Amino acid sequence: MTEGLKWTVNEVPKSDDKHLELMSEENVKKANEFHRSFPQYSVTPLQNLSSLAKYLGVKNIFCKDESYRFGLNAFKVLGGSYAMGRYIAKELGRDISELPYNVLSSDKLREEFGQATFFTATDGNHGRGVAWAANRLGQKAVVRMPKGTTKTRFDNIVKEGATVTIEEVNYDDCVRMAAAEAAKTEHGIIVQDTAWDGYEEIPSWIMQGYGTLVLEADQQLKEMGVERPTHVFVQAGVGSLAGAVVGYFAHKYKDNPPVMAVCEASAADCLYRSAVAKTGNLVNVTGDLLTIMAGLACGEGNTIGWDILKNHVDVFASCPDWMSAKATRIYANPLGDDPHVVSGESGSVPLGFCFTALHDEDAKDLKEALKLDENSVVLVMSTEGDTDPVRYREIVWDGLYGTNESLSK
């Protein structure tokens, strides 16, 4: 059953690929060394879903499980923390390698740097990561959240000591609001995981921070005897994580990259629409962007991420809510000896896309386009755990958002 799923093979004109070098292994290792200096750091699991792979007729399915990241239940802190570190390092005229966690969090550093106010917009995970990092480093955070934000996600950020509001506008308008406030605030800075003309340095640092999870996964695969995945499926909101993941693999395996697909929420499928347009330019999606995949409810793409994606992605997909909910249930009810994975609505959609391509009779053309077969080694990203526990239980226990159901209906 592929009801509501739309996809396209990437035929967008290629650019000069000037941003790919951002995601070189060398640059990503620099970010990873920074993260390793945090006492809360540990490598998150790469879950081996061997029974599911056998059921679906592929060699392997591996899931990078970010529900364990820094105790925050999501990957986003990797980007915000690294961008903060890079910003402070730049302001002080120092290299980030000179500013590990114990230096950044010291009284001496605060005397030297002072205190900045980091503004951001978020559906929950990015803002929580920014607030967490600001709190640990003795800085201030102001977070704007879009309408429809759940109380749990709001409360999680308040607990980190940030100033937080829920606004009556969508995510993209919250970004504009936070940027305008930062510009008017002394020692204010916008830390956003999307880029636009004139604002690219901090988003590029955020993407490099996200690279930590890809570097870990790549190293974990090698420890399991896998040289590289044949397929990588990753979700996208603005495309920062997707650009980081695709960029890392495209740069490292230039001569033999994996087949890579990007999965978006159908209510906010700006990258898919941009791919369909085939102009090379981003197409925005406006309106309320209603989807259970709150972390993917972004209608305006990251210009840096898009530049990488249009050059290296094979398939762009626009995915309905039920596909995400189904994958959340699959993770929660594993086959055989497969591990149980807690994957929230924004975390699970790549597995839902993979399952549909391999399992559904009317998805044979998609399976063929993705070149999936019995030798395929698939890597999917689960970017969050149950960041909204009530919604998670409704999906897993009550079967919410079954076939043909979506938040917008």
Where are these regions (language model features)?
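PLP-dependent amino-acid enzyme catalytic core
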Residues: 1-409
